[in-house]
């Protein structure tokens, strides 16, 4: 399975106080150790780095993501992301701007989204987004 890993899962994976049995973190660890393709997006890295982080934490994140395959949006992905968010909004499922772009990247590259953000699960009922389930 090819996964696009969202900010919520990376954040849990990097925290020291995350319980070891969080299903999404276990799935990420297995994917990284196995033969699954694991991707993230530049916008996800930005979300992780945003705000004040000690220099050593920034350095650790930079080192870990240096070998990661980053999905980057193309011009048409921005238009497609807006087209995804609109039907979700009409159906009462919130899909924010950045989340719409992440969803579009997953759809465009035929990836399953690994996330703990319930907004994606709700949106998946209205758009062709595959969200990982335990």
Task: Describe each model-derived feature in a short phrase.
Residues 1-40, 50-63:
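Short, well-structured N-terminal submotif of metal-dependent ribonuclease cores
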Residues 2, 103, 107-134:
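Acidic, PIN/NYN-like endoribonuclease modules and their adjacent C-terminal/linker elements
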Residues 5-6, 40-41, 94-96, 117-118, ...:
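Histidine- and aromatic-rich ligand-binding microenvironments
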Residues 6-7, 48, 81, 106:
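Generic structural signal for small/hydrophobic residues in well-ordered secondary structure
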Residues 10, 45-48, 120-121:
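A generic structural signal for short hydrophobic patches within well-formed alpha-helices
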Residues 25, 45, 58-61, 78-81, ...:
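A general structural signal for well-ordered alpha-helical segments in protein cores
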Residues 39, 71, 130-132:
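General small-molecule cofactor/ligand-binding pocket signal
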Residues 69-116:
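Active-site neighborhoods of divalent-metal-dependent phosphate/nucleic-acid chemistry enzymes
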């Amino acid at each position: 399975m090819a996964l696009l890993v969202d900010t919520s899962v990376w954040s849990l994976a990097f925290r020291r106080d995350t319980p070891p049995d969080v299903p999404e973190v276990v799935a990420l660890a297995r994917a990284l150790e196995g033969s699954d393709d694991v991707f993230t997006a530049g916008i996800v890295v930005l979300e992780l780095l945003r705000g004040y982080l000690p220099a050593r934490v920034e350095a650790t994140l930079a080192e870990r993501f240096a070998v990661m395959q980053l999905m980057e949006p193309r011009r048409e992905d921005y238009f497609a992301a807006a087209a995804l968010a609109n039907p979700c909004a009409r159906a009462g499922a919130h899909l924010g701007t950045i989340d719409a772009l992440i969803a579009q990247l997953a759809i465009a590259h035929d990836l399953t989204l690994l996330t703990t953000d319930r907004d994606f699960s709700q949106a998946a009922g209205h758009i062709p987004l595959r969200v990982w389930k335990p």
